[in-house]
Each structure stands twice: as C-alpha cells, then as structure tokens.
Amino acid sequence: MKGIILAGGSGTRLHPMTLVMSKQILPVYDKPMIFYPLTTLMLAGIREILIISTPHHMPLFQALLGDGSQWGISLRYAVQPSPNGLAQAYVIGADFVAGSPSCLILGDNIYFGHGLQGLLQQAAALQQGATIFAYHVNDPERYGVVEFDEGMNALSIEEKPAAPKSTWAVTGLYFYDSEVVDIAANLKPSARGEYEITDVNRIYLERGKLKVAVLGRGYAWLDTGTPDSLLEAAEFVRTLEKRQAFKVACPEEVALAMGFISVEEFARIAERAGKGDYGAYLRRLA
C-alpha cells in the first residue's frame, strides 16, 4: 500500500502565520505539523509516500523531510498548482499510485488513541473497497457527515450539510483500493467548484464497497486548521508527553518500532539530533 499526504492550500484561516509558511510546517507543540500524518502512515506500515503541496511551499517540505531514507521510507513530491478539492490528490498522484491500494491523509489532521495502530494496519490490509473513519462531533455541518442505520451500517454521506443527518463526521483519513484513481478522474466538480472526496466515498458506498470504522471513546481526532484548534492540539500533545514521558508522532521512534531502521541507525540519528528536549529524548531511547 502507498500513502499520500495532502499538504497544499493557503491556510487562510491561519493568516498571518501562513502568509509565507505552509500550515503543515507550523509547530504542533514540539514538532512540525506534518510529522503527525506522516507517522500515522508509518504506523499503518506504509513506506512509499507522496507529499502534495503548492509550488511555493514544496522546497520547504523537501528541505525538512528529504527523501525519507533516514526513517527507512521513500518520500516523493508532487505539486498541486491550485486547491481544487481533496479528490484531486488522486489525479495528481495517479502515476504514483500506479494500480496499488493507497491511503490519503490530510496534512493538518492528528490521530491518537490506544489501538489506533491496529485499526490502521487492518485498513491498510484491504485489497478491495474503501475504509474511512467516523468521529462524533458537536458541529457536523463543518464536515462530511455519514448517516448510519441502527446496526451502524453507513446509509448516506453528505458534504457539509445544512441539516446533518447525524453527528458522525468523516475524518481526513481514507483507505482505497486501486479503483480510486479512475473514480477520481471521472468526477465532476461540485457546486463550489471542487473535486470532492465525499463524492468518491459516496461511489464506494453505492457499490457496496465502503466500510466506515468508528473512532469511539479513547480516540482523539484533531483538526489544526484554525488558531484555536492549533493551540488545542499543541496543549493535547504537551499534556500527553509531560504526563507519560513519551513523544507523540516521533518519526525516528516509529521507524525503529516498525523495523524500518535498525538500532544502530537509530543511534546515529540520536547522536546528531541536537541539544534540545527532542534530541535528548532520542538519546534516552538509544
């Protein structure tokens, strides 16, 4: 399975912070935002990853992340000239996906919870159909919304409905089989002129090939697209790290745990990791 991180957009809700900086490189407590979706893919066992961003911001991601070899993964890059909807990621990334199943994750989404790795790896094992994740929210009109029957089987999906049929939001994490490229290529723009990922999910639902996994109590899904939500995410991560003395979304640690790099390679990274708390943490692990 291959992964795509969509890290485009202009981040207008975070102006002036994002006037010259990509939203996905802003810090969420002690590390760049993009480390969180990156490590989510790594926890799913995904090692081939495409990062999609704007022409202006692309050099920043390349300087920050490189080719991924330091973490035992392969990173490639592609440009999204203008933000025309989430499903556009599969038009831009068609050659990269090249007939493989894939996972798309939004670059400003953070996931955390006991058992998350198991859910991710289960979804990553799919060969047919699609798996998306639903999360209970207080403001469903801001999201794609999934309607369930009494048995928690998906009945419908709507994008930012004025009158939501449920309080279950579709999160920014999607697992698809190889058919997604053709589905995305044949979409028509929505009323707001975008290629909607909700339309992709709806097609899988109509074909009887959509699984919706519920992230219930004990899971956190954080969207960091506004100043308040960015601060809340940073406070959440800080609390976890201070209370339990571990790092959240540390790619070096995840790479070691997943067997992507050896103990010796990890130790070399830790030696070069600087004098701050992050480097000290890596050296303690080494």
Swiss-Prot record:
Known catalytic reactions: dTTP + alpha-D-glucose 1-phosphate + H(+) = dTDP-alpha-D-glucose + diphosphate
Binding locations of Mg(2+): 108, 223
CDD domains, alphabetized: G1P_TT_short (cd02538)
Requisite cofactors: Mg(2+)
Cofactor note: Binds 1 Mg(2+) ion per subunit.
Gene Ontology molecular-function annotations: glucose-1-phosphate thymidylyltransferase activity; metal ion binding
Enzyme class: transferase
Keywords: Magnesium, Metal-binding, Nucleotidyltransferase, Plasmid, Transferase
One of the GO biological process terms: biosynthetic process
EC number assigned by the record: 2.7.7.24
Transmembrane parts of this sequence: none
Entries under Pfam families matching the protein: NTP_transferase
SUPFAM superfamilies assigned to the protein according to its UniProt record, in alphabetical order: Nucleotide-diphospho-sugar transferases (SSF53448)
Database matches in Gene3D superfamilies: Spore Coat Polysaccharide Biosynthesis Protein SpsA, Chain A
Subunit-level organization: Homotetramer.
PANTHER family according to UniProt: GLUCOSE-1-PHOSPHATE THYMIDYLYLTRANSFERASE, GLUCOSE-1-PHOSPHATE THYMIDYLYLTRANSFERASE 1
Function, as annotated: Catalyzes the formation of dTDP-glucose, from dTTP and glucose 1-phosphate, as well as its pyrophosphorolysis.
Similarity comment text for this entry: Belongs to the glucose-1-phosphate thymidylyltransferase family.
Protein name: Probable glucose-1-phosphate thymidylyltransferase
Organism listed in the record: Sinorhizobium fredii (strain NBRC 101917 / NGR234)
Lineage start: Bacteria, Pseudomonadati, Pseudomonadota, Alphaproteobacteria, Hyphomicrobiales
